[in-house]
Amino acid sequence: MNPAHLLVLSAVCVSLLGAANIPPHPLNLINFMEMIRYTIPCEKTWGEYADYGCYCGAGGSGRPIDALDRCCYVHDNCYGDAEKKHKCNPKTQSYSYKLTKRTIICYGAAGTCGRIVCDCDRTAALCFGNSEYIEGHKNIDTARFCQ
């Protein structure tokens, strides 16, 4: 074998070994973001929902402060059920869906992790689209309002 080819092959193998230790990206979050963009008013971005109320974003505690925050509360619980009851990993679970006629269709057999997680995301995204966004509930003091 040509020494140059051997060197390239060795570099590829080392790269692949290193990649095996990289944790998976939360790919379904990309799907969830696309669903949210599809259902919310045009003047909003999905990022404006990332730190809203007590439950939209990482973690959550206390009582939801409004209907939109309740959407996130229900979504968090849906993911929790998917993990506990069905042994799914919602943050890395891939799934198939279609955005059509102002609704979202999830594909896959009922009861499979992909379908369960898609249904969680679908329900939350549609809820976002039907709930009022209150500017004063963005970036709230969670230590004060979410007990």
Swiss-Prot record:
Its cofactor is Ca(2+). Binds 1 Ca(2+) ion. It is found in: Secreted. Ca(2+) binds at Y55, G57, G59, D76. It comes from the Eukaryota. The active site is at H75, D121. InterPro entries: PLipase_A2 (IPR001211), PLipase_A2_Asp_AS (IPR033112), PLipase_A2_dom (IPR016090), PLipase_A2_dom_sf (IPR036444), PLipase_A2_His_AS (IPR033113). One of its GO terms (biological process) is phospholipid metabolic process. GO terms for molecular function: calcium ion binding; calcium-dependent phospholipase A2 activity; phospholipid binding; toxin activity. Its main location: secreted. Changing I116V: In 20% of the molecules. This is Basic phospholipase A2 beta-bungarotoxin A1 chain. It comes from Bungarus multicinctus.
